[in-house]
C-alpha cells in the first residue's frame, strides 16, 4: 500500500475541491442559497485595493469567499506570527475580516460552519508551520464568522456598530419570503425609516 502525501497542494485546487463538494452537499432548492462563482469573486476582489490594517466586512458571507480570497496570496503579509524570548508564538492579524450570515434550522447553520472550514483550508499551510497556535487559529475562525439566529432580518435585526474600510459582498436576492422581511422591518421603528 502506498502512502500518499497531501501536503503542498495548490490553494486553488483545495478551494475548487471544497466548492465542488459544497455544491453537492447543499441543495439550493432547500436552502434558497446560491454561491457566487469563484471567478466572479476574484474579479471583484482584484478591483479592491486591500492593504494591511484594513477592516473588511461581508454582511451576507455564505461560505466566506469574499473575505478569504483577499488573504489567499498575502497570508504572510496579513497574518504575522511573533515569538517572544521564551519561544511562545502569538498570531498577529494585520487585517480584520468579519463575515455574518443568518440561519435558523441546522441546515441553514451549516453555511457558517463551512465558512470556518473554508478558512481552515486557506490557512492550512500556516497552521502546519505553527502547530502551537491551533487554539489561536480556532479563536480567529470563530471571531471572523458570526451566525445571526435571532431574526429573519439577519444583520439588519441588530445593526453592526463597527466601521469598516471595505464591504465585499454579493447580497442575496430574495423572492420567496420577502413579505416576511417587509413585515419584520415594519415592526422596527429604526429600520422602517430606511426600508419601505
Where are the regions a protein language model picked out?
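Long recognition/docking surfaces used for binding and targeting
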Residues: 3-24
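Short, mixed-charge, low-aromatic patches
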Residues: 3-4, 27-28, 162-167
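Short acidic-aromatic active-site loops that bind/stabilize oxyanions
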Residues: 7, 30-34, 196
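Conserved S-adenosyl-L-methionine
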Residues: 33-162, 166, 174, 178, ...
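Active/binding-pocket-proximal capping segment
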Residues: 183-190
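Glycine-rich S-adenosyl-L-methionine
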Residues: 190-196
Amino acid at each position: 500500500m502506498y502512502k500518499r502525501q497531501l501536503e503542498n497542494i495548490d490553494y486553488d485546487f483545495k478551494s475548487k475541491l471544497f466548492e465542488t463538494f459544497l455544491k453537492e452537499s447543499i441543495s439550493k432548492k432547500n436552502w434558497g442559497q446560491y454561491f457566487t462563482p469563484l471567478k466572479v469573486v476574484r474579479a471583484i476582489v482584484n478591483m479592491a485595493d486591500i492593504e494591511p490594517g484594513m477592516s473588511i466586512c461581508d454582511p451576507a458571507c455564505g461560505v466566506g469567499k469574499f473575505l478569504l480570497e483577499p488573504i489567499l496570496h498575502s497570508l504572510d503579509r496579513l497574518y504575522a506570527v511573533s515569538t517572544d524570548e521564551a519561544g511562545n508564538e502569538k498570531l498577529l492579524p494585520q487585517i480584520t475580516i468579519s463575515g455574518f450570515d443568518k440561519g435558523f434550522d441546522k441546515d441553514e447553520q451549516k453555511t457558517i460552519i463551512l465558512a470556518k472550514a473554508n478558512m481552515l483550508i486557506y490557512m492550512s499551510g500556516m497552521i502546519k508551520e505553527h502547530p502551537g497556535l491551533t487554539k489561536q487559529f480556532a479563536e480567529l475562525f470563530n471571531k471572523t464568522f458570526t451566525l445571526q439566529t435571532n431574526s429573519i432580518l439577519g444583520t439588519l435585526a441588530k445593526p453592526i456598530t463597527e466601521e469598516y474600510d471595505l464591504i465585499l459582498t454579493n447580497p442575496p436576492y430574495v423572492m420567496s419570503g420577502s413579505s416576511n422581511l417587509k413585515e419584520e422591518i415594519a415592526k422596527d421603528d429604526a429600520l422602517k425609516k430606511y426600508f419601505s
